[in-house]
Amino acid sequence: MTSTLTERPRTDSDLGKPWNVIVLNDNHNTFQGVAFALSSTLPGVSYERGLKIADRIHNIGRAVVWSGHKEAAELYWESLRGFGLTMAPLERAS
């Protein structure tokens, strides 16, 4: 007996889109603390760049600090939360 495989259409139109790690503004983290957390966690983010991102978070209320594969996004999200940063839920990039 032989069987045939039929290909099912993909139902996830967002397949392959990156995930955003978003830090929210709060009233308990300092610019220096945010910069340290970002530079300690995210690849390619220096302390100086972390200060610029912290300023953006403060002025806008939130910032996408990293975007990429879901597994890495989850790891970075947990690490930043561990530093005490206020995190938005992971979001799919648009």
Task: Explain the meaning of each model-derived region.
Residues 1-94:
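Terminal domain-initiation and capping elements
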